[in-house]
């Protein structure tokens, strides 16, 4: 399940445990509680590591968050912390980038490639220009074609207008997504475009001219299928 906001997470937890979802949501929206955990409202989703856990169904909301904090610390072992440091990122920044990577592709083998591309952009000061951040900024996750009008949306999550990472993750990434960033593929690609066969994978390019050739193939495929939005 893709969880993009705190309210949906609260509802999901409430269905599994004897905790009122409003109580979970209340804590997640409490700035003092966020700060106690080491986050703010934008970065709090980074606390959660999606996995199957055995928990007491009658645990309290506070106990739930304590357990999630322990699982977070368990995931972020020294090896992963060292890998994050090596690429100049904190765990929260890794989470934020992993969320974008997982929105870009459902293809697990491709995720380290996509992560490597975004890390290249970050290291060269280029905007990420990640379409999923536009969908998040607009809260329109059904968009299939991003237009110039969409790219003009004023939002700190618009990675076309703002350089660097957005304020927080646009979804809760999986362990696979997090590890894709930590173990990203090293290459010289700076551009990518969805493949014209709609396979869910991408064509990668190291320069803009090559990228535009790939983009035209995809645009033509969209036009042929009459996908205009």
Locate the predicted segments by residue.
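Short, small-residue-biased leader/transition segments that mark boundaries at the very start
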Residues: 1-3
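Bacterial extracytoplasmic/cell-wall-associated proteins, especially those involved in peptidoglycan
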Residues: 18-22, 26, 33-229
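Short, structural beta-strand-to-alpha-helix junction motif
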Residues: 5-6, 60
């Amino acid at each position: 399940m893709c969880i993009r906001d705190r309210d949906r997470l609260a509802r999901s937890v409430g269905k599994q445990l004897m905790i009122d979802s409003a109580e979970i949501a209340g804590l997640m929206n409490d700035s003092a509680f966020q700060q106690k955990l080491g986050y703010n409202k934008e970065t709090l989703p980074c606390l959660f590591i999606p996995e199957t856990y055995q928990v007491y169904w009658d645990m309290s909301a506070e106990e739930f968050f304590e357990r999630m904090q322990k699982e977070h610390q368990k995931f972020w072992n020294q090896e992963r912390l060292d890998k994050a440091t090596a690429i100049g990122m904190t765990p929260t920044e890794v989470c934020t980038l992993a969320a974008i990577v997982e929105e870009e592709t459902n293809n697990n083998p491709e995720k380290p490639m996509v992560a490597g591309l975004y890390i290249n952009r970050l290291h060269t000061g280029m905007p990420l220009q990640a379409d999923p951040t536009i969908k998040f900024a607009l809260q329109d996750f059904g968009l299939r074609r991003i237009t110039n009008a969409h790219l003009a949306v004023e939002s700190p999550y618009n990675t076309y207008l703002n350089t660097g990472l957005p304020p927080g993750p646009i979804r809760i990434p999986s362990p696979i997504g997090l590890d894709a960033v930590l173990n990203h593929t090293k290459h010289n690609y700076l551009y990518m475009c969805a493949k014209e066969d709609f396979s869910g994978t991408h064509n990668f390019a190291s320069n803009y001219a090559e990228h535009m050739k790939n983009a035209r193939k995809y645009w033509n495929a969209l036009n042929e299928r009459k996908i205009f939005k």
